[in-house]
Amino acid sequence: MYQRSLFRGVAQGLKRSSVRFQSTSSGSSNGNFFLRHWKLLSVIGSFTAGVAIYDMSDVRSFIHGRIEMPLFHAFTTPEFSHRVAILAASWGITPKDRVADDPSLAVEVWGKKFCNPIGLAAGFDKQADAISGLLNFGFSYLEIGSVTPKPQPGNPKPRYFRLKPDLSVINRYGFNSIGHDAILAKIQKRVRKYIAKTSPQLLKQFDANPASCTDPAVLGVPRSLIPNKFLGINLGKNKNGNEIEDYVEGVRTFGNFADILVINVSSPNTPGLRNLQKKSALSTLLTAVVSERNKLNSPHPPVLVKIAPDLNEEELTDIADVLKKCKIDGVIVGNTTVQRPKTLKSTSHVEETGGLSGPPLKPIALNTLRTLRKHLSSDIPIIGCGGISSGKDAIEYARAGATMVQVYTALGYDGPVIAHKIKQEILAELKGKRWVDIIGKEE
């Protein structure tokens, strides 16, 4: 409908221009055509350029999905195209979802009202470069990171591989991060700019103590700085860092600037990291994390834990016990998988070391989510993540017990329209129901 109305407007405008053109061009010679009609041609050119620019500023434009994405996939490496996308979003030249979210998509959790249940998982905006640009794609929740205390380059390149027949990727980035200080500086600069525009009387207070001005009640918006949209900060550890202190330092550094904190103990690309999912180690870590979180200025951000999809039922039962004991606010299921399902069609890159994401991950992550939901206290929400690229996928996660969902790989294949597409497909599947009505309601 959007494309039809847009091109109908173009056609009508050109028709009117054509009438004027015909009335003034009769008898003119080819030699002085442009001189005689430069004003008319300028109007037509400006009009056409304006329409094209407006069209490209909307995530629904066919240009993004039908032209840009295939070109990127054909002529660039995955990591290069990822970097270009982040740069474009950071410069504010990426499109926006211009359709208001239907109220039936809203979900309230941790005392926060999300305008829709679709988030963008950590790993896309690792260095907090493009918070506003990515949220403008139509997501209600963005996780930056994973962020490590000290800068580290991650694993050597190449470390990101497309499995095109499976619409999947394998990555072994290895927590490449510019470190706490650099990322905190970016976030504080963004908040200061917002305060200067909306509440300049707070600038002196902010400059003296930035953390004192980040209460959403003071800002008037969440810490994402966008109404009904939220900023998560995903915390990791350095390759040779301290298993407890790295996360505690992350809570201390970012707790007053995040709507949500996520403890990532599940990346397969940092040696030994997944050992932190074991009952004793996880309990020790989360006890320290929650204690540090409780020292922050109020309101305290909820603490979530991101776990792997490769855990067995005994391990998931242990994790459920720890989450309840440590009073953790939520859990994300899950990260990438080290498994290589037999359903994979790709022949190249399949044996690369790293975590697999995309549609082949979905049945693995869904099974993990269902198993955890059986053992997890009902008051601890789950965010589902893994292979989600359609409204049907999202609804399958919701019925399995996910309060919200996240996408990652689908953004790289479908482009900026993905959040809009999933939301519209959810609405079609809901058939008048609300998202919250189907959570945990298996058919």
UniProtKB/Swiss-Prot annotation:
**What membrane topology was assigned to this protein in its record?**
Single-pass membrane protein
Name the cofactor(s): FMN
Catalytic reaction list: (S)-dihydroorotate + a quinone = orotate + a quinol
Protein name per Swiss-Prot or TrEMBL: Dihydroorotate dehydrogenase (quinone), mitochondrial
Quote the function comment for this protein. Answer: In the de novo pyrimidine biosynthesis pathway, catalyzes the stereospecific oxidation of (S)-dihydroorotate to orotate with reduction of flavin and the transfer of electrons to ubiquinone, which is part of the respiratory chain. Does not use fumarate and NAD as electron acceptors.
- Signal peptide extent: none
Transit sequence range: 1-21
Report residues binding FMN. Answer: A122, G123, F124, D125, K126, S146, N234, N264, K306, G358, G387, Y408, T409
**What would be the name of the gene that encodes this protein?**
ura3
The residues responsible for catalysis, as annotated, are S267 (nucleophile)
Q: Where are the transmembrane segments?
A: 38-54
Identify the keywords attached in UniProt to this record, alphabetized: Flavoprotein, FMN, Membrane, Mitochondrion, Mitochondrion inner membrane, Oxidoreductase, Phosphoprotein, Pyrimidine biosynthesis, Transit peptide, Transmembrane, Transmembrane helix
What EC number(s) does the entry state?
1.3.5.2
InterPro entries reported for this sequence: Aldolase_TIM, DHO_dehydrogenase, Dihydroorotate_DH_2, Dihydroorotate_DH_cat, Dihydroorotate_DH_CS
The record's Pfam families line, in alphabetical order, gives: DHO_dh
Per its UniProt entry, which superkingdom is the organism in? Eukaryota
Q: Which GO terms describe its cellular component?
A: mitochondrial inner membrane; mitochondrion
Q: Which residues bind substrate?
A: K126, N171, R172, Y173, G174, F175, N264, V265, S266, S267, P268, N269, N335, T336
- Report the subcellular localization: Mitochondrion inner membrane
Alphabetized CDD domains for the sequence: DHOD_2_like (cd04738)
**Listed NCBIfam families:** pyrD_sub2
Q: Give the main location.
A: mitochondrion
Task: Report the cofactor remark.
Answer: Binds 1 FMN per subunit.
Q: Which family does the record claim for this protein?
A: Belongs to the dihydroorotate dehydrogenase family. Type 2 subfamily.
Q: Which residues carry this modification: Phosphoserine?
A: S168
Pathway the protein contributes to: Pyrimidine metabolism; UMP biosynthesis via de novo pathway; orotate from (S)-dihydroorotate (quinone route): step 1/1
